[in-house]
Amino acid sequence: MYDNEAIVGQDVAESGLRREDVFITTKLCQTRAGYELAWQGIEESLARLQTDYIDLLLIHEPYDEALDMYRALTEAYRQGVIRAIGISNFNAREYLDFIGSCDVIPMVNQVECHIYYRRKELQQALVTQGTQIQAWSPFTEGKKPIS
């Protein structure tokens, strides 16, 4: 999605670090929408990252095909290919609608969240259902002072 998986995989391989000491998160975007394409995306990410598992895999946005994508993630999670599965950029309504059809509740919802955009309704929905919030812009992308 961000065209950085190959370099991350190479750097981890060359770093001398043990794989279990590095936490790798990546995402599937719309070009991998749907069940089959999601599986293809998982396999491609594993190859580019030069690893046999991904620590956290997210669906980038609430695409129309997100449930089909998530079904592939769920199967990969059950097989141990992905250690944690989640979503990104789902608001409270989208999240609650989505989890109504999930066998495994997303472990993470990665969203914009910071002092100026606290997402209280979303945070409450996530806490109630057992999903962790992960901020993708905790310091407002440097656009506003936080002191």
Located regions from the model:
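N-terminal binding-site loop/beta-alpha segment at the start of enzyme catalytic domains
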Residues: 1-22, 139-142
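Short acidic capping loops at alpha-helix termini that bridge into adjacent secondary structure
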Residues: 18-22, 52-56, 83-84, 105-108
